[in-house]
C-alpha cells in the first residue's frame, strides 16, 4: 500500500512525526548525527537538530501529498523562516550559550512530495 494512503487516517501531528522520523533516518544515512527533535519555544519550533562534523544543522521537515496548495518548499514562507531563525537562536542560547552570529550552524530542509524520494536542501537559508 502506498505511503500516502496509509497516512490518510492519521492526524496531522502523527503524520508530521512520521515524516520527521523518516527525515531523521535519511539524514543519519547521509552521515549526520541526531541531537534533538521537536524543540518548542514561544517564538517557534525546530523539527530536528542534527550535527554534521562541527556544524549544527537545524532541519525543517515538510511534506505534501500533492501540489494543489503549493509544494512542500513553497510552504516555507518568510514568516516561517523568521520563526525558524528565532527558535534556532533560542536553542543555541539555551544549549551552548551562543547565538546565530557566533555558532557554526546552517538550516536544511528535507521535503517529501507524493511518492518521490526525499529532497534534501542544504543551507536553505543561505
From Swiss-Prot:
<dbReference type="InterPro" id="IPR003509">
    <property type="entry name" value="UPF0102_YraN-like"/>
</dbReference>
<protein>
    <recommendedName>
        <fullName>UPF0102 protein HD_0802</fullName>
    </recommendedName>
</protein>
<dbReference type="GO" id="GO:0003676">
    <property type="term" value="F:nucleic acid binding"/>
</dbReference>
<dbReference type="InterPro" id="IPR011856">
    <property type="entry name" value="tRNA_endonuc-like_dom_sf"/>
</dbReference>
<dbReference type="Pfam" id="PF02021">
    <property type="entry name" value="UPF0102"/>
</dbReference>
<dbReference type="InterPro" id="IPR011335">
    <property type="entry name" value="Restrct_endonuc-II-like"/>
</dbReference>
<comment type="similarity">
    <text>Belongs to the UPF0102 family.</text>
</comment>
Amino acid at each position: 500500500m502506498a505511503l500516502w494512503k496509509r497516512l490518510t487516517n492519521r492526524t496531522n501531528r502523527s503524520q508530521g512525526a512520521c515524516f520527521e522520523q523518516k527525515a531523521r533516518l535519511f539524514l543519519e544515512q547521509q552521515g549526520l548525527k541526531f541531537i534533538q527533535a521537536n524543540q518548542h519555544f514561544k517564538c517557534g519550533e525546530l523539527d530536528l537538530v542534527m550535527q554534521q562534523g562541527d556544524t549544527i544543522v537545524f532541519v525543517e521537515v515538510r511534506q505534501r501529498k500533492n501540489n494543489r496548495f503549493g509544494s512542500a518548499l513553497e510552504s516555507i514562507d518568510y514568516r516561517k523562516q523568521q520563526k525558524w531563525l528565532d527558535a534556532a537562536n533560542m536553542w543555541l542560547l539555551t544549549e551552548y550559550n551562543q547565538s546565530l552570529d557566533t555558532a557554526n550552524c546552517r538550516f536544511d530542509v528535507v521535503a517529501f512530495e507524493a511518492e518521490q524520494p526525499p529532497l534534501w536542501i542544504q543551507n536553505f537559508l543561505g
